[in-house]
Amino acid sequence: GLNPLKRHSAGIACYYTGPKPALHKWPVKEFFGSYVAPRRIEGIPQGNHYDLSVNHNPVVNNTNGSVVGYKYFNFDYTYGKNNLQLLINVVPAGIDATIDVWVNSPYVSRGGVKIGSMSLNSSMKQVKTELKTGVTALKEMRGKKALFFVMKSSTAERSLCEIHDFVFVGK
């Protein structure tokens, strides 16, 4: 599994849903939830192709009810660590909202465990901002687990933020 102690681009998401299905109106698709935005780099990038300055795609259109998921992180790396936090770089969209952080599943009925939550508010500047949440429950978790971000807001059909990258930190 992926090392949660290394920063990862949000664009590696393998699971993203919205509150309702996308509409396919050729040649355009209309999305009602999260998706990975395409980015292009002019020329051939030099150096490490996995460097976030080269290889970066944000997850956008994160509306109320959207879920963004990642498989799999190896939480043996965080086992036993103190003061564990999740740091996530977002661009707020100017509305009040919450991003809940889950492991295993985004649903309790399917074995999901909520490990943290972050708030966005309408007064936040719409520039790249680092949000933090304590994720102390990871201190006791081991093995490969899926990670999910669940978007919540009372404002329907408006993106809460763009998600750029994230990393877990601890001592």
Question: How should these model regions be labeled?
Answer:
Residues G1-K171:
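Extracytoplasmic
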